Regions:
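Fungal secretory targeting signals
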Residues: 1-22, 481
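N-terminal catalytic cores of secreted or lumenal carbohydrate-active enzymes
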Residues: 22, 28-204
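Active-site neighborhood of glycoside hydrolase catalytic domains
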Residues: 184-203, 213-318
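Aromatic/acidic polysaccharide-binding cleft in carbohydrate-active enzymes
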Residues: 307-381, 385-393
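Carbohydrate-binding surface patches
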Residues: 390-430, 469
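Solvent-exposed beta-hairpin/edge-strand motifs
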Residues: 426-448
Length: 481
């Protein structure tokens, strides 16, 4: 969810050296920070407006080059899709109807399928499967283009499950799910997962019943759907969801939790959920809104101790230059070590999207520089690759075992300099004189995604020139661990 972004002076770069002299970085070939599962985006809210657009599906979910507004855009190649189970409905239940926050935009109201409490049977008239068509359409377009990891997530229970019938939150930001509806929330999500598998040709690999549940800003006058849920209630919902998924033959779908807003809150929540709940979780999801701060290593340690997978399942900010994105993303690779990474809104205004858009007006503008920064990572570090220790706080590395290819992404924050990359730890560091393909993006403005082939191997090293505030990606073939 959107939160106040850090200023440019708080980009979390304190650990990166600002030096003009040439710097040598040694890639650690013996390291293994996990097998990469992919890059993704959440479909709410942008797909509600643009879910019928094939050109946008091509841009986000393929690596082909797409002509978009007379500009050739390199497709981002996202393969993770987070589909939102809506909480809103315009259908009253008896004398009750949904209370709408005075501050919420229509584009942020996601229509839910369980429109009244009369029946839990998904084939009954209490369920409406003909709403939210555009979000579903984009999910299916993504699937047709090769996206292979789908997660169902909830921002709030259905409005009629909340204490005040307002899916934006409680008046004071307290818990807003009725105690007798915690199990019903699990039924809701399990029914969607089952229906999607049987009718939409979509198998949700994971289901997340919570979203930033410990936050106290989910209030009745909020700008989006959200719900504070106490720790004990979170644990209860997780247990109920496991049972409901199993009852529908969805034992293969695992539960992720708890999508807390910050790394620090994630640590607190995970330490408080209890063994029963944690034993029902297959992956830790955490959001990246602590930006350059927070206990990334603490979240990782819990994941390691519990044998759980780990994703940064939501990240976003309003810095269209790409500076915050590359800084925080590299810190995630360095200290959080997730195996999946999801950008919140690829289409949005005010710098939040990687392509400018107004989801309410239905207008789409141009790709910003952040788009091309994300492309440096998402187009080259692909699912199935082994993440390596890049050897420095400004370097990320990944190894493609099937194709014997090494990928390095690096940023130079200081004065222009050459970075020398040492591959001597590999059993085969390509060959002397081999071409190293390079792509470069200038943060802020300038070069967007420029490919060149002038860099070559010299023995087991290669050197590349970096301007200040430049991101570069290198692909080195014929490398063996």
């Amino acid at each position: 969810m959107q939160s106040k972004p850090l200023s440019a002076v708080a980009l979390g770069l304190a650990s990166i050296s600002f030096v003009a002299a040439d710097t040598t970085v040694t890639i650690n070939a013996k390291s293994n920070n996990g097998v990469w599962e992919g890059w993704g985006t959440s479909l709410a809210w942008w797909a509600q407006a643009f879910g019928d657009r094939d050109d946008l599906a091509d841009i986000f979910f393929t690596t082909t080059t797409v002509n978009f507004s007379n500009v050739e855009l390199p497709g981002l190649g996202l393969n993770i899709v987070r589909h939102n189970a809506g909480a809103s409905s315009t259908t009253p239940v008896g004398s009750d109807s949904m209370v709408v926050s005075p501050s919420i935009k229509p584009s942020r109201q996601v229509m839910g399928h369980w429109i009244d409490w009369n029946s839990a049977d998904p084939t009954s008239s209490s369920w409406n499967w003909d709403i939210d068509l555009k979000q579903r359409s984009m999910m299916q377009k993504a699937h047709a283009r090769g996206a292979d990891r789908f997660e169902l997530f909830s921002n709030s229970p259905m409005w009629w499950m909340t204490s005040n019938h307002n899916p934006s939150g409680d008046a004071k930001g307290g818990e807003n799910i009725q105690s007798w509806n915690t199990a019903q929330h699990a039924v809701y999500l399990a029914n969607i997962a089952k229906y999607a598998k049987d009718n939409w040709n979509i198998t949700f690999e994971s289901v997340e019943p919570l979203n930033e549940p410990s936050a106290d800003w989910w209030k009745a006058d909020g700008t989006q759907e959200g719900c504070h849920i106490d720790i004990s209630t979170q644990a209860s919902i997780i247990g109920s969801l496991r049972s409901e998924l199993n009852d529908r033959g969805l034992q293969g779908a695992f539960i992720s939790a708890s999508d807390e807003n910050t790394y620090d809150q994630a640590v607190k929540t995970l330490k408080s959920l209890g063994d029963d709940a944690l034993n029902n979780i297959g992956r830790i999801n955490v959001h990246g809104y602590q930006y350059g701060d927070g206990d990334r290593a603490g979240v990782l340690q819990i994941a390691v101790d519990r044998g759980l997978r780990l994703w940064n399942s939501e990240y976003g900010e309003n810095d269209a230059t790409g500076q915050q994105l590359v800084s925080n993303l590299i810190q995630d690779f360095r200290w959080l070590k997730p195996t999946g990474w999801v950008y919140w809104q690829v289409l949005d205004g005010g710098g939040w999207g990687v392509i400018d858009a107004d989801n309410d007006a239905g207008t789409v503008g141009a790709a910003n520089q952040k788009y091309f920064v994300l492309a440096q990572f998402s187009r080259h570090i692909r699912d199935g690759m082994q993440i390596l220790d890049g050897g420095a706080d400004n370097v990320v590395a990944a190894y493609d075992n099937a194709n014997e290819k090494l990928v390095i992404v690096a940023v130079n924050w200081g004065d222009a300099q050459n970075l020398v990359f040492d591959l001597s730890q590999f059993t085969q560091a390509s060959t002397d004189g081999a071409v190293v393909t390079r792509w470069r993006t200038q943060l802020g403005s300038g070069d967007q995604y420029i490919k060149s082939t002038e860099v070559t191997m010299t023995g087991t090293t290669f050197s590349a020139a970096f301007e200040q505030n430049m991101v570069e990606t290198f692909e080195i073939k014929n490398v063996k661990i």
